[in-house]
């Protein structure tokens, strides 16, 4: 890890599968960081904010949805030129073992999700159409009191996102520190 990059200790303990933070804030203040677990981060009402994922630097529009599955991929959302005073952010942190050969994620029902998760090692940004498809689920997941149903909702979100072919890889392969493997 490079100097100045925070290694975040997430709120998940060894028996937790996921953690959801749904917050409204006036500005982005959290520093550039990375963490051991996967993250799906949704931001709305933050046009002009700067998103940095690895070596990708972009100014976002009103909606942003990014999936990061690499523990070494640093990322941050910065205030930059965002004028909004009511930024809405939903962060879903979760753990899945994609490396295990017998993982259910490698079976046919999960194939599209697995492939998307592998691409997300570089960070994936989703189109507005994909975001709008899962928007109601993103809004509902944080209020889900039953853990099982929240996990079910997360898998539904991931599956719906995996059906969109237009997700944009954010970081370059050299910067993302990812071993490129092929199953062909």
Identify the function of each model-found stretch.
Residues 138-142:
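Amphipathic alpha-helical segments within well-ordered protein domains
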Residues 37, 86-88, 151:
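A structure-centric signal for secondary-structure junctions around beta-strands
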Residues 1-67, 72-75:
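Generic protein-terminus/edge-of-domain signal
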Residues 2-12, 70-137:
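A hydrophobic/aromatic-rich effector-binding and dimerization subdomain
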Residues 41, 90-91, 154, 158:
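Long, contiguous hydrophobic alpha-helical segments, chiefly transmembrane helices and signal peptides
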Residues 59, 110, 150-151:
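Alpha-helix N-cap/helix-initiation sites
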């Amino acid at each position: 890890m490079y100097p100045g990059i925070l290694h975040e200790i997430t709120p998940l303990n060894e028996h937790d599968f996921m953690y959801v933070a749904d917050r409204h804030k006036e500005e982005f203040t959290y520093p550039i960081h990375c963490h051991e677990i996967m993250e799906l981060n949704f931001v709305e009402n933050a046009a002009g904010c700067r998103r940095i994922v690895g070596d990708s630097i972009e100014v976002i529009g009103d909606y942003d949805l990014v999936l990061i599955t690499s523990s070494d991929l640093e990322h941050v959302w910065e205030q930059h030129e965002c004028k909004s005073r009511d930024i809405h952010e939903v962060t879903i942190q979760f753990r899945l073992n994609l490396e295990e050969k017998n993982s259910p994620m490698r079976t046919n029902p999960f194939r599209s999700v697995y492939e998307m998760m592998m691409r997300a090692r570089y960070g994936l940004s989703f189109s507005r159409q994909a975001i709008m498809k899962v928007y109601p689920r993103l809004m509902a997941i944080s209020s889900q009191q039953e853990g099982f149903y929240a996990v079910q909702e997360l898998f539904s979100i991931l599956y719906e996102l995996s059906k969109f072919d237009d997700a944009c890889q954010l970081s370059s392969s050299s910067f993302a520190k990812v071993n490129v493997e092929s199953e062909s």
